């Protein structure tokens, strides 16, 4: 079965202090998303789409894109996430600095997606097992009504070196019922994991809670659903919403 891996790499990396998606960290200069791409190819994916800012193209191709194509024979397609795309009804958004979110990112790759597809962040490490799991789920998705998500235990996704954003999941009988996007989750010195987005000492979270790291699987018909959802989102934006984003976990 043909399957596409869509990598969201256009984020600004503001918390990191640079473009984290193209920072070298492996023993031979690998960048983080390379590990996910090779894991995906081993899991049976046969097409890669990278969503980036136009200004990143030269660096991405030089750092690893051309090398992966040469080594594997797999073509990498590049999709540009820019604020004027899919926002014709609100032309003022073309000047927006902050990306419009992960739903918008996937829509920017729409022309390159023809098969069941998985979506990942460029700046997270997922592991081979996660890509195997989503690859096994994709053939079971029959329409836009079906989707899949690989979840992680919260305790395995936090760091003592800063806060993270995770989608805290509610499930029933193996089905995803709700995702609550939760910001500023921190592993505290006392060993507890807290949501620090409010005031005070924060809300203690269950370390065994299932969370999303944006590893989703979709039928290509889901792109129509995303387009309608994003259009509705755009029409709700106000002049004070410069940082508000349209997010996959919230949509789901």
Name what the model sees in each region:
Residues 1-13, 27-119, 126-127, 131, ...:
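Conserved N-terminal catalytic core of the sugar/cofactor nucleotidyltransferase
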Residues 11, 55, 155, 220-221:
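Alpha-helix/helix-capping structural signal
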Residues 18-19:
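Conserved catalytic-core motifs of eukaryotic protein kinase domains, centered on the activation segment
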Residues 120-123, 152:
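Active-site flanking residues adjacent to catalytic metal/cofactor-binding acidic residues
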Residues 128-216, 220:
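Conserved core of the sugar-phosphate nucleotidyltransferase
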């Amino acid at each position: 079965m043909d399957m596409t891996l869509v990598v969201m790499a256009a984020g600004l990396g503001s918390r990191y202090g640079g473009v984290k998606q193209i920072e070298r960290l492996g023993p031979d200069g690998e960048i983080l998303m390379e590990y996910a791409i090779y894991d995906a190819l081993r899991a049976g994916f046969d097409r890669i789409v990278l969503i980036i800012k136009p200004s990143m193209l030269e660096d991405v191709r030089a750092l690893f894109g051309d090398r992966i194509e040469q080594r594997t024979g797999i073509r990498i397609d590049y999709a540009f996430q820019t604020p004027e795309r899919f926002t014709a009804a609100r032309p003022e958004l073309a000047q927006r600095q902050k990306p419009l979110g992960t739903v918008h990112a996937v829509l920017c790759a729409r022309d390159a997606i023809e098969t069941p597809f998985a979506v990942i962040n460029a700046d997270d490490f997922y592991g081979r097992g996660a890509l195997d799991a989503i690859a096994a789920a994709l053939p079971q998705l029959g329409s836009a009504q079906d989707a899949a998500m690989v979840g992680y235990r919260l305790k395995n996704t936090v760091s003592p070196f800063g806060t993270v954003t995770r989608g805290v999941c509610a499930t029933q009988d193996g089905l995803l019922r709700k995702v609550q996007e939760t910001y500023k989750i921190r592993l505290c010195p006392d060993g507890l994991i807290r949501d620090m987005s409010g005031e005070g000492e924060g809300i203690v979270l269950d370390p065994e809670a299932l969370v999303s790291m944006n590893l989703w699987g979709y039928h290509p018909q889901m792109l129509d659903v995303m387009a309608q959802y994003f259009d509705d989102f755009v029409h709700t934006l106000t002049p004070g919403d410069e940082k508000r984003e349209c997010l996959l976990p919230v949509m789901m």
